[in-house]
């Protein structure tokens, strides 16, 4: 039987901590495989370069997507989201997941959701819509 591929998108330490049990469950399921897409603060030394945390936990990273974290202007946010859509879209087109899991409401996740939607990839948006200050979705 062909395993179903579940893409997991994470953009920061807080999301990753909450996604950890989802990743473990997929990893332990005989009919599922995960493809971990890491972006945002995970790749930024100013935020602790938490990419190392993920690899120490034993998870394989399928793709690293650099998205500039310049919040100096609204235009910079628009450019970051646009770049994210293009970059994440390329990754999703390559790995061809059966679905993607995106956590919360940050702009990196927003980029992932837009890319997935345009590629007809079903999306599981976990804890979206919670009241946040500065959220993107």
Task: List PLM regions with ranges.
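Generic secondary-structure signature for well-ordered alpha-helical cores
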Residues: 28-31, 59-60, 93
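Active-site and donor-binding regions of nucleotide-sugar-utilizing enzymes
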Residues: 5-12, 17-27, 68-137
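Conserved nucleotide-sugar phosphate-binding/catalytic loop shared by glycosyltransferases and other
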Residues: 33-80, 87
């Amino acid at each position: 039987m062909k395993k179903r591929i579940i893409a997991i998108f994470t953009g920061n330490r807080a999301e990753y901590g909450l996604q950890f049990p989802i990743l473990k469950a997929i990893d332990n399921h005989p009919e599922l495989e995960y493809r971990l897409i890491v972006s945002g603060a995970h790749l930024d030394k100013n935020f602790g370069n938490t990419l190392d945390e993920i690899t120490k936990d034993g998870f394989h990273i399928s793709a690293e997507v650099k998205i500039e974290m310049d919040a100096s202007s609204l235009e910079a946010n628009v450019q970051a989201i646009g770049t994210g859509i293009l970059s994440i879209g390329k990754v999703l087109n390559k790995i061809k997941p059966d679905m993607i899991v995106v956590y919360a409401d940050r702009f990196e996740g927003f980029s992932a959701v837009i890319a997935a939607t345009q590629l007809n990839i079903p999306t599981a948006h976990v804890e979206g819509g919670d009241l946040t200050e500065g959220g993107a979705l």
